[in-house]
């Protein structure tokens, strides 16, 4: 059963980008969008950065060292972004499409669970902690913000990355939380394998009839 029937969704592939300019572009896009603006998905990998969510507490930053710490207005606590992690920003007009925040969170979690199942990885969501887990290890973090009835921020799926920076924090505020990644569970699988499935699953779950690939240029959001 699909959740909504919009006309299309725009897909933009950003490659490897620093966090702050992309975050600002997301804000600008959301502030400027109107009731007729198409929804968008942005696929990006970020240069190494710790981001503190709105609920973030300083004590969960154990020893950030040379990795910058950036305050974010997404939900949740501290997490790490770096190369080899697939971030997908979800900019959906909830009000126009009559989708609740809880519905969207569940759809994003199911998108990741279905994507991992494609690579024969069994995973699950947890009612007490947003995200997706393989056993007790976290493989995907999730954090959203809603403004003017529209979502931004999204998910971060560990695919083939250096997980050691997670040891410098309490991921998502949980001391000792262990992290998993796709490449350790499905050897040989990389970002280029994962992101088409991720998009396909999201589009299917939310009922978009068409995906339109467009270029991304930071200057368009200044």
Swiss-Prot record:
One of its GO terms (cellular component) is cytoplasm. Substrate binds at residues 74-81, 141-143, 154-156. It is an enzyme of class 2 (transferase). Residues 35-210 form the BPL/LPL catalytic domain. Pfam families: LplA-B_cat (PF21948). Pathway: Protein modification; protein lipoylation via endogenous pathway; protein N(6)-(lipoyl)lysine from octanoyl-[acyl-carrier-protein]: step 1/2. Its EC number is 2.3.1.181. One of its GO terms (molecular function) is lipoyl(octanoyl) transferase activity. It catalyses: octanoyl-[ACP] + L-lysyl-[protein] = N(6)-octanoyl-L-lysyl-[protein] + holo-[ACP] + H(+). The active site is at residue 172. The record marks 138 as: Lowers pKa of active site Cys. It is found in: Cytoplasm. Belongs to the LipB family. This is Octanoyltransferase. It comes from Serratia proteamaculans (strain 568). The lineage of its organism: Bacteria, Pseudomonadati, Pseudomonadota, Gammaproteobacteria, Enterobacterales.
């Amino acid at each position: 059963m699909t959740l909504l029937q919009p006309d299309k969704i725009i897909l933009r592939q950003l490659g490897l980008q620093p966090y702050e300019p992309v975050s600002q572009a997301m804000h600008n896009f959301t502030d400027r969008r109107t009731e007729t603006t198409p929804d968008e998905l942005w696929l990006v990998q970020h240069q190494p950065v710790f981001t503190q969510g709105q609920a973030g507490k300083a004590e969960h930053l154990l020893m950030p060292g040379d990795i910058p710490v950036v305050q974010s207005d997404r939900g949740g606590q501290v997490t790490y972004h770096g190369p080899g992690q697939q971030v997908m920003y979800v900019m959906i007009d909830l009000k126009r499409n009559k989708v609740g925040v809880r519905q969207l969170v569940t759809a994003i979690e199911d998108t990741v669970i279905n994507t991992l199942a494609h690579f024969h990885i069994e995973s699950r969501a947890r009612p007490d902690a947003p995200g997706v887990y393989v056993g007790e290890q976290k493989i995907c973090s999730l954090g959203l913000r809603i403004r003017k009835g529209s979502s931004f921020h999204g998910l971060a799926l560990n695919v083939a990355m250096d997980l050691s920076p997670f040891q410098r924090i309490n991921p998502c505020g949980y001391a000792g939380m262990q992290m998993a990644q796709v490449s350790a569970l499905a050897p040989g699988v990389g970002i280029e394998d994962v992101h088409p499935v991720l998009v396909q699953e999201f589009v299917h779950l939310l009922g978009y009839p068409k995906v339109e690939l467009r270029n991304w240029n930071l200057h368009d959001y200044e």
